[in-house]
Amino acid sequence: MSIIDIGGQVREGEELNVLAVENWLKQQGIVLAGEAKVTQYTGGASNWTYRLQYDNLDLILRRPPVGTKAKSAHDMAREYLVQKNLAQSYPVVPEMIALCQDESVIGCDFYVMKRIEGIIPRAKLPPELNFSEQDVHALCINVLDKLIELHQVPYQNTPLADIGKGEGYCRCLLYTSPS
């Protein structure tokens, strides 16, 4: 039994223009061998996530959903840069390949990174994973361990320090009552 998340069929209405993405990747100097096998990961709370599996590369593409969005709700550049800068101090971050801010490619900003094999924690795990109660417990412990490691990253002397919301931002969110 495999306990690795592999994605599933791309949902109707969420198809990806793979040819446009491939052309763009090639313009970035990325060599792609073979035809892409495209799958989509489900169960996320925000951005759409696709797997593009080539003979020589296994990639993940992240993009915002279609429709009206708050200006900062799906900031692909921020998501990309946080991970790219975090990788210097935290080894569990995937290698960032490229960020596209040219909406003429697929209609929105997106970024591509190398895939890391594993499980994507989410509210409903894919039934094909067939996890036992012990498997789910181990996954939860692993997620907590990684979050603890992440929060111990000394970001203050890295480019990450420049992208925060500033001192007191979280307190403001927690203690500001809606009017």
Regions found by a protein language model. Name each.
Residues 1-3, 7-9, 14, 25, 35, 49, 57, ...:
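Intrinsically disordered, low-complexity regions
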Residues 4, 33, 140-141:
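Short hydrophobic/aromatic segments of transmembrane alpha-helices and their interfaces
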Residues 175-179:
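Conserved small/polar residues in nucleotide/adenosyl-binding loops
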